[in-house]
């Protein structure tokens, strides 16, 4: 496959096309086309407003393998999938559209994303739709905020917030205390539609992370059966 990207001072556009393994045939796993566009109406040293729109389509071969969508706990504390559609064996194509937004003010960052997925099916069967998204916020307690990068140093990852930059004097290996960040997140995914009962999951979690790798978490989830649980 290949990807092409262009950018200006406050905007980016990226498009790509990918296929299967060349040894087994480019179309053996379907051919996918994706695109993403972003715009930052506010882009200052300490303040950024980011807006984005993305879409993709994958054409699936009629080989009987089908398609499945699933999700585990975001903290990966549990091995099993909390929601799972099982195999949709008559899937002929997948369309996705995503909306994204983020706002940074100094050490504070809030971001959100919503994705809607439609699965087309062979034989005139009804198209099924699934959706998911999240909202999260974080604040870095003793360091400046994450930098916003319009263009990548290499590759095609445009318009993203970089990781926390730890000053040399703050590194634990240099006798410092590290850098601390507190964050909270709510996310949800709905894999129920048109007779497919993949389940509905909602997660809430709060995390305190240090640059030294120490972390603590309190997590609440609402599983597909409506049960409530917590972990820490």
Where is each model-derived feature located?
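Outer-membrane beta-barrel pore domains
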Residues: 65-232
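Aromatic- and glycine-enriched pocket-lining scaffold segments that form the walls
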Residues: 1-62
């Amino acid at each position: 496959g290949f990807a092409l990207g262009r950018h200006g001072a406050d905007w980016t556009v990226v498009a790509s096309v990918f296929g299967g393994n060349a040894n087994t045939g480019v179309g053996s796993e379907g051919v996918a086309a994706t695109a993403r566009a972003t715009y930052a109406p506010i882009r200052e040293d300490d303040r950024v407003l980011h807006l984005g729109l993305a879409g993709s389509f994958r054409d699936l071969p009629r080989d009987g393998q089908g398609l499945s969508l699933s999700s585990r706990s975001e903290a990966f504390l549990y091995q099993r999938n909390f929601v799972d559609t099982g195999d949709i064996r008559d899937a002929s194509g997948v369309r996705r559209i995503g909306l994204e937004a983020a706002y940074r003010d100094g050490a504070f960052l809030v971001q959100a994303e919503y994705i809607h997925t439609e699965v087309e099916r062979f034989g005139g069967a009804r198209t099924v739709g699934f959706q998911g998204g999240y909202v999260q916020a974080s604040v870095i307690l003793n360091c400046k905020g994450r930098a916003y990068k319009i263009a990548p140093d290499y590759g095609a990852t445009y318009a993203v917030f970089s990781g926390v930059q730890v000053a040399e004097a703050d590194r634990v290996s240099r006798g410092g205390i590290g850098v601390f960040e507190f964050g909270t997140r709510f996310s949800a995914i709905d894999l129920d539609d048109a007779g497919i009962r993949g389940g509905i999951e909602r997660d809430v979690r709060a995390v305190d992370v240090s640059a030294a790798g120490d972390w603590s978490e309190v997590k609440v989830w609402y599983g597909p059966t409506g049960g409530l649980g917590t972990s820490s």
